[in-house]
Curated annotation (Swiss-Prot):
CDD domains: UBA_RuvA_C. This is Holliday junction branch migration complex subunit RuvA. Residues 143-150 are annotated as: Flexible linker. The lineage of its organism: Bacteria, Bacillati, Actinomycetota, Actinomycetes, Mycobacteriales. It is found in: Cytoplasm. The gene is ruvA. It comes from the Bacteria. GO terms for biological process: DNA recombination; DNA repair. GO terms for cellular component: cytoplasm; Holliday junction helicase complex; Holliday junction resolvase complex. Transmembrane segments: none annotated.
Length: 195
């Protein structure tokens, strides 16, 4: 399978990037924070997981192997598919997710779009012993104004001026301080599209 993709970033969208490698453009699904690290026209390398279904083959890209491994571990949970696994990593970085699972924090896990209380309880039950160690420093969920940087970077990567991106992001976060990276990015794009 395809374990990584390296090449020129041809396009960046809300939920994916297209990376051209050896003359082939690979559509790679990724979290907003991963997409924020990419710049159109520059070379990039993403660690990938290839998910093959009866009717599709989809690449999911990550900044590092740790995030990819956690994504694959999440897929082992009953009822969790690639979209929910990716949404989980969009809301929580790997360290924060490990901490929530280790603490059995069902409430934190229900903040992920598509995960209800039962799904969160199932995740904790099935993954508590499978996840890697949690460092002493712990991790923080992506939330509030901690997501400002990744959202602004993603907007700039999509071609908006830095000042426009910052203003739109600040307005979105003022209206919804609990917004996730992906919801803030969507709202900012919607706001910028109306101008």
């Amino acid at each position: 399978m395809i374990a990584s993709v390296r090449g020129e970033v041809i396009d960046i969208a809300l939920d994916h990037a297209v990376i051209e490698a050896a003359g082939v453009g690979y559509k790679v699904m990724a979290t907003p924070s991963t997409l924020a690290t990419l710049r159109r026209g520059t070379e990039a390398r993403l660690i990938t997981a290839m998910i093959v279904r009866e009717d599709s083959m989809t690449l999911y890209g990550f900044v590092d192997g740790d995030a990819r491994d956690l994504f694959l571990t999440l897929l082992g949970v009953s009822g969790v598919g690639p979209k929910i696994a990716l949404a989980t990593l969009a809301v929580y970085d790997p360290q924060a997710l490990r901490q929530a699972l280790a603490d059995g924090d069902v409430t934190a896990l229900t903040r992920v779009p598509g995960i209800g209380k039962r799904g969160a309880e199932r995740m904790v039950l099935e993954l508590r012993d499978k996840i890697g160690p949690v460092s002493a420093g712990g991790g923080a969920a992506v939330g509030g104004h901690a997501i400002r940087g990744p959202v602004v970077e993603a907007l700039v990567g999509l071609g908006f001026a830095a000042k426009q991106a910052e203003e739109a992001t600040d307005k979105v976060l003022a209206n919804d301080p609990e917004a996730t990276t992906s919801s803030a990015l969507r709202a900012a794009l919607s706001m910028l599209g109306k101008k």
